[in-house]
Amino acid sequence: ACLGFGKSCNPSNDQCCKSSSLACSTKHKWCKYEL
């Protein structure tokens, strides 16, 4: 399963939900919406 908004993540292994337009922030290390 992919990671939802606000979940902690690893930028080098981005597991955030792409279908929800989420991406792992390299700065904050959590899933945020890509605009």
Curated annotation (Swiss-Prot):
The keyword Disulfide bond applies. GO terms for cellular component: extracellular region. InterPro entries: Huwentoxin-1, Huwentoxin_CS1. Disulfide bonds join C2-C17, C9-C24, C16-C31. Its main location: secreted. It comes from the Eukaryota. Pfam families: Toxin_12 (PF07740). The keyword Plastid does not apply. Expressed by the venom gland. Keywords: Disulfide bond, Ion channel impairing toxin, Knottin, Neurotoxin, Secreted, Toxin, Voltage-gated sodium channel impairing toxin. It is found in: Secreted. The presence of a 'disulfide through disulfide knot' structurally defines this protein as a knottin. Gating-modifier toxin that reversibly and voltage-independently inhibits human Nav1.1/SCN1A and Nav1.7/SCN9A (IC(50)=111 nM). It also shows moderate inhibition on Nav1.2/SCN2A (1 uM inhibits current by 55%), Nav1.6/SCN8A (31%), Nav1.3/SCN5A (27%) and Nav1.4/SCN4A (23%). This toxin inhibits Nav1.7/SCN9A by interacting with the S3b-S4 paddle motif in channel domain II. Belongs to the neurotoxin 10 (Hwtx-1) family. 22 (Htx-4) subfamily. Negative results: does not inhibit Nav1.5/SCN5A, Nav1.8/SCN10A, and presumably not Nav1.9/SCN11A voltage-gated sodium channels. This is Mu-theraphotoxin-Hd1a.
